[in-house]
């Protein structure tokens, strides 16, 4: 294709939906090299819908050469039908923000663009020979001009796909800023944050130049277009007359890098020569081409990672543990780790020259890492070592897993979470101030009530005296009056004088009746507020003094008044206790846990008080406080492991001091109405936590739930009169592996996480007595055998969650999060089938290096959770936090094996707990030690 024709197509494409067409070479990244897929191809930017674009790459075949090839194969009696079926001639890629567009120099030295695909990176290199102009400078300028135009069009397409608006609405700066991070000459393989390793260049001695050329040319030629092999080899050989360069570091830089450390100690377990790299400016630069990596046993179950020179002088040492954030990369046969011990945290890398040595190091390091974390000798099989090593390998490919091809990525996913509603009334200081003000108002009201009573008594005495002097007027005043409830904020009323007319007296009586009605309404509202606040305050009506006609009832009235005074004193005592407890919880305790209901209410625990917040679309607002959470003996406790039930009508909770009991709170009262003993065959059963029988059970009236402790699990039916525990299983006699967390699917399948990092999957029929034998005479219950057990790399599982359909699991460890597909490509499920050697390998979610550095190298994730969805919906996000950072991963991208797409937001205070609102993926309730907010997308 001529240059004129190609340039013409840029401005007047043959199809209206094609924005640009270019010719060149097409590569994909494989084992650290660009492997040529198409020697000649055409790249087209195709628009198929509004704001939706595709990159289409098509192989160009020379028909004459193809016919000759077929004739030759027919003459040889070979069939090429199978070869044609397996031959891929076409690729297409959706243009989205996740494309990660890079501007690179291709393998042939021409202008190139690379982008991220589903499983690896792809590169398009412009063809410099497909040009009628013999001037090389003009060729290069033409290629660069066309390449920049292609890049500009791609940037505009990315802008439109992000904001669903024409790119003309955005300025050049907005478009450039949006694509700036992708416009770099550094390329990176998929699923890693590692940039292409670029080293400093030094001149080698002339005597070794020819050897280096022969070593470098052969492997690199295997990945170049076949028709240019001879020409490329000539260019390289001709350049041997001058100076030849390889990736290395100068001797001066190597010497300056060496630090004086303590001598190497311990038993040597592994030794291998490697090259050492240091990450600077998102690139790994070669620091020393010839160092030795050592793995030594320095103490029992303590191992040290050394980097030394040939003379055994250590230049680097670090204890092996999870704080290294270890990562293996098979394609680059390299190992990367994080060092937070220095003043400036940084990442290092070692690259092996022999694949066998790399595999040996990978297996050895995996075992040592497991033993350090568990503080126990590894006793697993060789298959378990390979499985654990694959978890630490970022680019490991599992053939049993099928990732999504539908991008499912839209502008909504790109919106960052922002704190749109920080209601100042939700801060504990303000809530406590409000509480104290309300107490002062109550005290002031009681003082006003006493003054009202005294004024009423004086007015009554005046009425009696006036009645003796004038019998006619006193007879009217002797009418029996109904008792009046105490006013809220009412000034004392003066009685009418003797000289007032009957009309004035009637008007005053009407006013009194109206005031009584208003007071009763105000008291009803106040009683409702007090009920919501969880405080039992008895409002006793106060009666006015009686006249002589009521003397016969004085004794009864005195008795009633005595009872009223007793009840009022009791209510005042209750109020006083509530005041003290609230003040204690608010001043001495911090927010400790959060649970979000599906009816737009959230519950935050602070000491023995539960704060109730309304969480609607407008924001979050404090509603009331449930105080004085007590046991049967009246002792207060701080609830743990809460769980909502029966459409947010009841709240289950555990007491850390009585671990064999479960408490049920009626949120309509609100008060603890039942305390259940978890007894199994007349033996108390400890309960570390509870989980619903089915996912989203809080939206139904199902009362059954699952409890667990250690390696035991049991089904609880609160409707049973005596034995609440109906079925129980125990997991054997291994006390070193205990259950730490659990989650259920919509069909009742159960996933458990353990302290050894294992994940155990149980069928939905686990507690079905018709399908499973539970008649064991063992007082601990029958043996629980999981359908599938996934080994861990040693880090305890601190949280676990499962999608409603049971196809995906998210497990949280301290420094990383694992996402595990529970279903294989053949439809097998880890919950229902015994997968054995086919068990899927987890994918680790690790923060980017720059974010880890922001945190000072300290990462401590809270239990990650999927967003809560209803029927016929699928989860879209994973939510967690560490320190003061709130993090949300895009789950749709994770299902495509793209693991580094997440949003991170920093707050001033540390995050205690966080949870999505029900059926919302854009609103998050965030709890801090002294505040509660709603963070949502714009």
Swiss-Prot record:
Keywords: Coiled coil. It comes from the Eukaryota. Residues 56-89, 461-582 form a coiled coil. The keyword Electron transport does not apply. One of its GO terms (cellular component) is cytoplasm. Residues 440-477, 494-531, 548-575 have a biased composition (Acidic residues). Residues 66-76, 576-587 have a biased composition (Basic and acidic residues). Gene3D superfamilies: YVTN repeat-like/Quinoprotein amine dehydrogenase. Residues 63-83, 434-587 are annotated as: Disordered. Belongs to the VID27 family. This is VID27-like protein. The lineage of its organism: Eukaryota, Amoebozoa, Evosea, Eumycetozoa, Dictyostelia.
